[in-house]
Amino acid sequence: YVVNPTNVDIKGTITNGGLNLITSIDVKWSDGTNTYTDNLTGLNIIMNGTYNFTHSAQLIVNSLAANSLTVWLEYAADLDTSNNTLTTTIAGLTSIPAKTTVGEEKTGTWCGWCPRGAVALGEMESTSSFIGIAVHNGDPMTISAYDDNIGTYIPGGYPGGGVDRVLEDNPAYFSTMHATRVTDIVPCIVNSITAVYDQSTNKISVATEAEFIGNIIGDFRLSCVIVEDDLQSSNSSWDQENYYGPGGSGNSTNMTFPANVNNGFSFNTAASPVPSASFGGYDHVARSLSNNDILGDAGSLPSGTVNLGTYNHIFTDVSTNSLAGYNDVGFNWTKAHAVVMIINAVTGEILNAGKTALTSINIVDSWDCDPVNGCVDPGTGIGNYSALATCNAACNTNSIEESNTLSFNLYPNPVKDRLVIEGQYTSANIYDVFGKAVLTTDYQNTIEVTAL
């Protein structure tokens, strides 16, 4: 893709796959109407050697029409001409749109090396032109249609990382892969996304506008993934295996979230497995895939050629009870985003993408127990109590102060499933009524006590 009008250099690399030295060769290219030839002489290309060339004739792009380009070599001594020709299409654009990359991470709670991918995505959160998606395997967060097909673009073991389904590597290299892809010229952009959660229907509605900056030939589609942060459950199937903890094979490798992500939790000091609440829950989790098709929604963009202009699409509503892991963690719309991608359905390449936080309508009253203000409606519809009277009955808050320097708030009292401690502390010991220590933990805002 190039900005119209412009002249394009025809460049390439010649590789000598034969035994004989190549001293001269003809390089030709055609736009379907005219053919241009360079007779290259004085060469010294040995067996398996290479030579980089730039053709003396440039391709002139002076419209938004697609330019078919064929480049080939002619060498009389070549016994195998099957690998001498390359064909591509060069399209003119009216401008260069901003590029956003998508980093997909293959992960699973069963995978002891997978904290590496979680930390890598956490490190990329400060990069606004990067969108991270965690694609889970073999655990309650798995979306079969996503998990079954992501290996086509990110082959190999776990964890695995890839950007735009073009580059794939260790997820620790997300930053490098992003830097490579974000400078690529693409012919399209996601202009806007509207994502609304309706609590009266428990459905998520997403609409988008995409824009193509030229007349682009191909099969392109729009795709939407709902992602959510801070997913945690006391169910043991949500515990994360961890090879980076004390005595683990990876303990010598620093595996710590940035300070502003998950409170800087370090897997290096955590046991295995790690309860999800200990590290603040799973982030960037793919919870739904539109049309259950990794290549996007068929018919969401014109087929054959997508002409210059804007295109609107409304995705099929998502029922929240169909979200991956819903039975364990439900859905918190305040921590969810809609990711819209423009995908080449032939190659799988993600050309561009956008992300937006969900908004809401028809939110019902609910209440949380605030240690200072008592029962408060958070306005999210997902407070811990659906009735104010129930909240008032349970909201018996204890406050502990020491020397006017340290202050802690603990609630609810009595505690049932989770104990919330508001305040700064290093560690906590919990004792039963007989004075026996039943739990020792490092700093956590929320402590699971279901098993006590």
Predicted regions and their residues:
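Terminal connector regions
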Residues: 60-92, 342
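Short, solvent-exposed loop/linker segments at the N-terminal edge
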Residues: 1-7, 197-201, 411-415
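Asparagine-centered strand-capping/turn motif at beta-strand->loop junctions
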Residues: 13-18, 212
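Intrinsically disordered, low-complexity Pro/Gly/Ser/Thr-rich segments with frequent PxxP/GP/PP motifs
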Residues: 34-62
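Local sequence-structure signature of Cys/Sec-based thiol-disulfide redox active-site neighborhoods
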Residues: 95-130
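Short, conserved sequence motifs used for protein processing/export or organelle targeting and
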Residues: 76, 131-363
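Residue-level detector of functionally pivotal "anchor" positions at catalytic/ligand-binding pockets or at interdomain
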Residues: 1-4, 92-101, 359-364, 395-411
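C-terminal outer-membrane/trafficking sorting elements
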Residues: 401-452
